[in-house]
Every structure is written in structure tokens, then in C-alpha cells.
Amino acid sequence: KKLSAKHILRITGDCPLIDPRLVDKILKIYKENNFDYVSNIQRRSFPDGMDIEVFSFKKLQEANKILISKSDREHVTKYFLRSDKIKKYNFFQRKDYSNIRITLDTKYDFQLIDKIFNNFNNFYFSLDDIIEFYHKNTLLFDRYKKLSEQINFQKLDKGQQIWQEAKNFIAGGNMLFSKR
């Protein structure tokens, strides 16, 4: 508001490997069309850690007037995703790489990202370069992903742990709660 911004590009701090070319593609779609919200997270196809969102400041102001939950205020784009009043577009790629984890939430994520940086001779590498590195080192990526998921799982409260376990055995995990 202070800067009279009309549009907001949201890239969170846990996504240090963002590919500027991907940002440019998403911005181009946003600029050339009449969308309120464009992202690559509605239907995941990019690695976790390549999360990009663009939305209008006007829609953010409108959301601010109606949002009351603490969760919505903290993660305002969740409202954009579920609202039918928001004209949205999801940018995705045909090849699904959503199983690749290159986000920075745990010390293991940091260790993997450090290995990615050390693999390249300079800081100018793309998502394609990371994916090529992934294909040559899938066991490395999978090991760090598993370690990070174990830490994140330990942080969940008991109810969330039960639901998470149920999802592995029951389609959707929701039947667990209908039986209680």
C-alpha cells in the first residue's frame, strides 16, 4: 500500500532455488491475461521449492476485508485458491516433478541445497539444471527428502499424526474420522 503496488509477486523464503525464467513465464501469463491470481501451486507439477504466486493488490485488499480466520490472514493465498470470486490460472508443466523436494525447511533440506549449489560452478543454474542433477542423483534427493519428512512428521500433533498414518492406508484418510 505504501508503495502503491498494483501487483504482488510472492516467493517465500523457503524457496531459495527459484528459477528466474519460471518467474518470468508466470509473470507474462499474469500480465497478458486478465487473471486475479496466477501460480504454479494449484495443481503441482514443479518441485516443492519452486512455488510462485502473482496476484493483484486490489484482490488482496478485498480479501483483507472479509477474512477472519488467523490461518487465512497468515496464508492469504489459500483464500484465493478456494474462492470462486477470484479469476485464477495454474501454470503447470506436462512432466510432473512435484515429487522433488528442494525447499528449505529443515537442516537436511539445507544440506541438499548446499550439495546442489556445490555441483554447479556458478550461481546461475536453472530448474532444468537441477532436474538433470536430480536424475543423476535420485537416491541422494530421496534420502534427504525422507529425512526432512521424518522431522516434519515429528512436529505434527497426535491428531495430525493419526490422520497422516491413515492416509497411507485409507484412500483419502477421511474414513478414519467418520468411524469415531
Where are these regions (language model features)?
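Conserved nucleotide-sugar donor-binding
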Residues: A5, I52-N64, K107-Q111
